Amino acid sequence: MARVKGGVVSRKRRKRILKLAKGYYGAKHLLFRTAKEQVMNSYYYAYRDRRQKKRDFRKLWITRINAAARMNGLSYSQLMHGLKLAEIEVNRKMLADLAVNDAAAFTALADAAKAKLAK
Protein backbone atom coordinates (compact mmCIF):
# COMPACT_ATOMS: atom_id res chain seq x y z
CA MET A 1 0.00 0.00 0.00
CA ALA A 2 1.30 3.46 -0.89
CA ARG A 3 2.23 5.95 1.83
CA VAL A 4 -0.23 8.81 2.31
CA LYS A 5 1.61 12.06 2.91
CA GLY A 6 -1.34 14.10 4.17
CA GLY A 7 -1.32 16.81 1.52
CA VAL A 8 -5.07 17.34 1.71
CA VAL A 9 -5.04 17.69 5.50
CA SER A 10 -2.07 20.09 5.45
CA ARG A 11 -3.67 22.22 2.75
CA LYS A 12 -6.94 22.35 4.70
CA ARG A 13 -5.12 23.39 7.88
CA ARG A 14 -3.15 26.12 6.10
CA LYS A 15 -6.21 27.33 4.25
CA ARG A 16 -8.12 27.61 7.54
CA ILE A 17 -5.36 29.75 9.11
CA LEU A 18 -5.06 31.96 6.00
CA LYS A 19 -8.83 32.42 6.00
CA LEU A 20 -8.67 33.59 9.62
CA ALA A 21 -5.88 36.01 8.63
CA LYS A 22 -7.95 37.59 5.87
CA GLY A 23 -7.63 41.38 5.95
CA TYR A 24 -4.33 41.44 7.85
CA TYR A 25 -1.63 43.84 6.64
CA GLY A 26 1.32 42.81 4.45
CA ALA A 27 2.67 39.27 4.55
CA LYS A 28 0.50 38.45 7.55
CA HIS A 29 -2.38 37.47 5.28
CA LEU A 30 -0.26 35.79 2.59
CA LEU A 31 2.44 33.67 4.25
CA PHE A 32 1.38 30.73 6.38
CA ARG A 33 3.95 31.07 9.15
CA THR A 34 3.48 34.80 9.72
CA ALA A 35 -0.30 34.42 9.37
CA LYS A 36 -0.31 31.65 11.97
CA GLU A 37 1.70 33.79 14.40
CA GLN A 38 -0.60 36.75 13.86
CA VAL A 39 -3.76 34.67 14.28
CA MET A 40 -2.39 33.29 17.56
CA ASN A 41 -1.60 36.83 18.72
CA SER A 42 -5.07 37.96 17.64
CA TYR A 43 -6.70 35.27 19.76
CA TYR A 44 -4.54 36.37 22.70
CA TYR A 45 -5.45 40.04 22.20
CA ALA A 46 -9.15 39.20 21.93
CA TYR A 47 -9.05 37.14 25.14
CA ARG A 48 -7.08 39.81 27.02
CA ASP A 49 -9.14 42.73 25.81
CA ARG A 50 -12.50 41.14 26.58
CA ARG A 51 -11.38 41.42 30.19
CA GLN A 52 -9.75 44.84 29.73
CA LYS A 53 -12.99 46.22 28.25
CA LYS A 54 -14.79 45.69 31.57
CA ARG A 55 -12.08 47.65 33.41
CA ASP A 56 -12.08 50.41 30.79
CA PHE A 57 -15.83 50.94 31.00
CA ARG A 58 -15.76 51.01 34.80
CA LYS A 59 -13.02 53.70 34.64
CA LEU A 60 -15.10 55.71 32.16
CA TRP A 61 -18.21 55.50 34.34
CA ILE A 62 -16.28 56.57 37.44
CA THR A 63 -14.77 59.53 35.55
CA ARG A 64 -18.22 60.68 34.41
CA ILE A 65 -19.75 60.23 37.86
CA ASN A 66 -16.86 62.14 39.47
CA ALA A 67 -17.27 65.06 37.04
CA ALA A 68 -21.01 65.27 37.70
CA ALA A 69 -20.55 64.85 41.46
CA ARG A 70 -18.07 67.73 41.56
CA MET A 71 -20.59 69.92 39.73
CA ASN A 72 -22.90 69.16 42.68
CA GLY A 73 -20.26 69.94 45.32
CA LEU A 74 -19.23 66.37 46.18
CA SER A 75 -16.29 64.16 45.33
CA TYR A 76 -16.87 60.72 43.80
CA SER A 77 -16.07 58.91 47.05
CA GLN A 78 -18.34 61.21 49.09
CA LEU A 79 -21.18 60.67 46.63
CA MET A 80 -20.82 56.88 46.70
CA HIS A 81 -20.59 56.83 50.50
CA GLY A 82 -23.62 59.11 50.80
CA LEU A 83 -25.65 56.92 48.44
CA LYS A 84 -24.71 53.85 50.47
CA LEU A 85 -25.79 55.59 53.70
CA ALA A 86 -29.06 56.63 52.03
CA GLU A 87 -29.54 52.99 50.99
CA ILE A 88 -29.80 53.97 47.33
CA GLU A 89 -28.54 51.06 45.25
CA VAL A 90 -27.68 52.39 41.80
CA ASN A 91 -24.79 50.85 39.91
CA ARG A 92 -22.03 52.91 38.33
CA LYS A 93 -23.25 52.29 34.80
CA MET A 94 -26.69 53.74 35.61
CA LEU A 95 -25.20 56.64 37.59
CA ALA A 96 -22.94 57.55 34.66
CA ASP A 97 -25.91 57.40 32.30
CA LEU A 98 -27.91 59.69 34.59
CA ALA A 99 -24.96 62.07 34.86
CA VAL A 100 -24.77 62.39 31.06
CA ASN A 101 -28.44 62.22 30.03
CA ASP A 102 -30.53 63.31 33.04
CA ALA A 103 -28.75 65.94 35.13
CA ALA A 104 -31.86 66.68 37.23
CA ALA A 105 -32.16 63.06 38.40
CA PHE A 106 -28.44 62.93 39.16
CA THR A 107 -28.72 66.17 41.16
CA ALA A 108 -31.59 64.64 43.17
CA LEU A 109 -29.41 61.63 43.99
CA ALA A 110 -26.49 63.91 44.90
CA ASP A 111 -28.77 65.93 47.21
CA ALA A 112 -29.95 62.73 48.91
CA ALA A 113 -26.33 61.70 49.41
CA LYS A 114 -25.45 65.16 50.80
CA ALA A 115 -28.36 64.98 53.26
CA LYS A 116 -27.19 61.62 54.60
CA LEU A 117 -23.57 62.80 54.83
CA ALA A 118 -24.64 65.87 56.84
CA LYS A 119 -26.25 63.71 59.54
From Swiss-Prot:
What InterPro entries does the record point to? Ribosomal_bL20, RIBOSOMAL_L20_CS, Ribosomal_protein_bL20_C
One Pfam family linked to the record: Ribosomal_L20
Q: What is the lineage of its organism?
A: Bacteria, Bacillati, Bacillota, Bacilli, Lactobacillales
Annotated function? Binds directly to 23S ribosomal RNA and is necessary for the in vitro assembly process of the 50S ribosomal subunit. It is not involved in the protein synthesizing functions of that subunit.
- Organism domain of life: Bacteria
The record ties this protein, via PANTHER family, to: 39S RIBOSOMAL PROTEIN L20
Tell me one GO molecular function of this protein: structural constituent of ribosome
A Gene Ontology BP annotation from the UniProt entry: ribosomal large subunit assembly
**Keywords, ordered alphabetically:** Ribonucleoprotein, Ribosomal protein, RNA-binding, rRNA-binding
> What is the designated name of this protein?
Large ribosomal subunit protein bL20
- Which cellular components does GO assign to this protein? ribonucleoprotein complex; ribosome
UniProt lists the family membership as follows: Belongs to the bacterial ribosomal protein bL20 family.
